[in-house]
């Protein structure tokens, strides 16, 4: 099941792309070196795990970490004039309250990573998902890192799905980290359909991986397994093998091991369930998914799978949004 590692011509970003920062992700890998990574924290166990992952991204991949902590104003009955005044105070960052909050957040994160951090930090007011997306745009983030916990029906009723909403609105990849994870992933399940989005997601997974990672290219076959003739099954299998080989070639660089697997799901089983079950069986510590398509049907399909992966909350998830630009 292991595909050979191959070297590819895309292993590094060209100088012009690095300077411009605007080349489509399908043409260049995601490289975090020297680029902003936004860590969103609320002090929860999963957010502190995300802080440890962000610290590892800075240490091992030379990312430049920025921090945002959002004071959620949704549940506070703040009159519009006062809300505007607080927002102005937030924007100028001059209040002692903000400075005290920043000191508290910095101390909390320093305790989580085991050393004093000097990352740029902002405490802002607003709806968490919208504020995080705005801050990511403000700092030019190549990646957002957030904590990820399990979401139930009550969370949806109360509109308390910050991580999922960030993934739906952000213009860059979003890495959701579960509380049990404190290091960069080493065995990554990359959900693929062999489209351009698959290459984007696999490359993004590589960009956040630890040293000598294994990328498990995973295709979920929605057919029931029956074929008109045996030859049709052979042709289908050969096509899948060619697709896996091409992805490995396009992403390949030194230090990566590629595995691949085809999952056959029962009619009653969703794509997300099949991916999660295999991730548990194979010991994968990250699931990646993504698309660069923007049609209505594509958004619905990709959105439903991503939503299920995020709401389940038992595996860290990297979602690459349907955008053409990195």
Model-found features: residue ranges?
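Active-site phosphate/pyrophosphate- and oxyanion-stabilizing loops and adjacent acidic/basic residues
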Residues: 55, 107-110, 164, 203, ...
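Structural beta-alpha unit
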Residues: 1-33, 46, 53, 72-75, ...
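A short acidic, glycine-rich active-site loop
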Residues: 86-103, 234-243
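General small-molecule cofactor/ligand-binding pocket signal
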Residues: 66-68, 120-124, 175, 216-218, ...
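Glycine-rich, Arg-bearing micro-motifs that act as flexible, cationic patches
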Residues: 143-165, 184-185, 286-312, 322-326
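Small/aliphatic-rich secondary-structure junction motif
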Residues: 7-9, 18-19, 24-90, 116, ...
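Short, structured interface segments
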Residues: 161-180
């Amino acid at each position: 099941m292991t595909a050979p590692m191959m070297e590819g011509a895309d292993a590094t970003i060209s100088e012009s792309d690095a300077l411009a920062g605007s080349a489509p992700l399908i043409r260049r890998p995601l490289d975090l070196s020297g680029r902003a990574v936004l860590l969103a924290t609320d002090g929860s166990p999963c957010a502190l795990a995300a802080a440890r992952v962000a610290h590892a991204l800075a240490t091992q991949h030379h990312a430049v970490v920025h921090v945002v902590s959002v004071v959620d104003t949704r549940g506070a009955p703040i009159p519009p004039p006062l809300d505007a005044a607080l927002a102005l105070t937030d924007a100028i960052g001059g209040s002692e309250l903000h400075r005290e909050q920043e000191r508290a957040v910095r101390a909390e994160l320093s305790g989580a990573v085991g050393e004093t951090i000097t990352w740029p930090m902002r405490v802002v007011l607003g709806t968490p998902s919208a504020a995080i997306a705005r801050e990511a745009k403000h700092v030019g983030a190549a990646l957002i890192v957030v904590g990820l916990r399990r979401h139930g029906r009550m969370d949806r009723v109360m509109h308390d799905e910050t991580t999922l909403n960030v993934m739906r609105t952000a213009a860059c990849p979003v890495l959701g980290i579960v509380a049990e994870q404190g290091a960069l992933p080493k065995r990554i399940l990359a959900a693929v359909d062999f489209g351009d989005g698959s290459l984007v997601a696999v490359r993004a997974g590589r960009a956040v991986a630890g040293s000598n990672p294994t990328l498990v290219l995973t295709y979920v076959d929605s057919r029931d397994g029956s074929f008109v003739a045996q030859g049709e099954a052979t042709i289908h299998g050969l096509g899948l093998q060619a697709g896996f080989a091409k992805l490995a070639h396009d992403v390949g660089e030194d230090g990566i091991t590629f595995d691949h697997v085809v999952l056959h799901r029962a009619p009653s089983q969703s794509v997300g369930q099949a991916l999660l079950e295999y991730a548990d069986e194979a010991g994968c510590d990250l699931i990646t998914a993504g698309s660069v398509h923007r049609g209505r049907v594509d958004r619905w399909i990709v959105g439903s799978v991503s939503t299920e992966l995020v709401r389940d909350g038992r595996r860290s998830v990297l979602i690459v949004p349907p955008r053409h630009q990195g």
